[in-house]
């Protein structure tokens, strides 16, 4: 990062000049697809996914080093009584990931996906967004930079997920700030908020948006004031993947909040991304619609942990395998249409 200027300056520069897809690789993928032993378009979105992989990786579609990156953070807003679980559960779940006992571990084993877990100062929750900014600009920028390291070990498909007690409140606040409407439209039960607790959750989002209202026209200010460390790190990871032309699968409502920040900063910022699934959290489909995306899966899930993105990675791997492994009409001796 630069040693001059404001902490966000480097990210504003990156967001202004994002690399695009490789048109030659896309053309080559389309030409091969036209020769495969199937009617045109018969594989539906699998074909679109293969083209997307080719365009962003600049090669024939292949997934050889898929990675799930989970970012874990804690939030000061939990003291407002908006969740039935204490913040200590975040650390406990990080330990569960390390021990191989979480749902995401089983999915990664099933689909042969790598897994990295990044815990982000769990003993130091962010500021309570109903009272103060979640992060300083310096801390937010540093956390984004930390998130960029998710791709350091090498990957050709990055799945973005998270863990953090209270972070569906944070996601709701971000989407409310970016897209308007009412707070109630964006707030859902998360890990089980209902009744009076759900009312407190809505009130917290309303209070936070009102407190920071004068600063919410800037997406990066939305991130630092209403976000959290895992949101900032996910935004950094998605951005780093773009700079290296690595395709990304985004998980649920909270991961989508990080994506929404980037989309607000540059309308093309998510062109290298797919939405893995639509979760049961009520605001998620609305947020996906705002991004102009279509999720790959709709399984009624609302766990987080990158689980929906990881399941979608199995579909992406299948798309690449079909594209590369299927015979052509000529090689199989199958008659093509006239």
Swiss-Prot record:
Cysteines joined through disulfide linkages: none
GO process annotations (BP): cobalamin biosynthetic process
Record Pfam families: DBI_PRT
Superkingdom of this protein's organism: Bacteria
Entry GO MF terms: nicotinate-nucleotide-dimethylbenzimidazole phosphoribosyltransferase activity
Enzyme class: transferase
Keyword vocabulary terms for this entry: Cobalamin biosynthesis, Glycosyltransferase, Transferase
Record-stated family: Belongs to the CobT family.
Name of the protein: Nicotinate-nucleotide--dimethylbenzimidazole phosphoribosyltransferase
Organism this protein belongs to: Rhizobium rhizogenes (strain K84 / ATCC BAA-868)
